[in-house]
């Protein structure tokens, strides 16, 4: 459907890229020529996904990181930038959830989910965005 080199020269970070939709997106981006970075909390899951991508001929690297921690995000983004230049794309895929009827969802449960989805997405988008603006780079989220 797409030209095999569609994303050649692109450097894309997929949060929550070790499993599920994030893994599938990262794998497809790599097949289309992108250099892919994935992050998540479970290092072993990330490493398995990176191995699969590399074994399929792609380029990928993993960073274990909790996106709820802004300092950890900044450190990770600094490492990625130092590893070959600026990212050109960011996919905010990381999410948290658990099965619970709405009537049983507690404020603490909602906070656990929203810290990943809202705050984590903001922290990582802000970390990339401020660097893109500073370096006059057109990144994509």
Predicted regions and their residues:
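Conserved NAD(P)H cofactor-binding loop of Rossmann-fold oxidoreductase domains
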Residues: 93-98
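Conserved glycine-rich Rossmann-like NAD(P)H-binding loop of the short-chain dehydrogenase/reductase
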Residues: 34-48
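A short, exposed helix-loop element centered on a Lys and neighboring polar residues
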Residues: 125-126
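The beta1-alpha1 cofactor-binding region of Rossmann-like NAD(H)/NADP(H)-dependent oxidoreductases
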Residues: 64-75, 107
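Substrate-binding pocket helix/loop in short-chain dehydrogenase/reductase
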Residues: 101-102, 106-114
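Conserved glycine-rich cofactor-binding loop
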Residues: 11, 16-20
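Active-site loop of short-chain dehydrogenase/reductase
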Residues: 10, 58-59, 85-87, 132-141
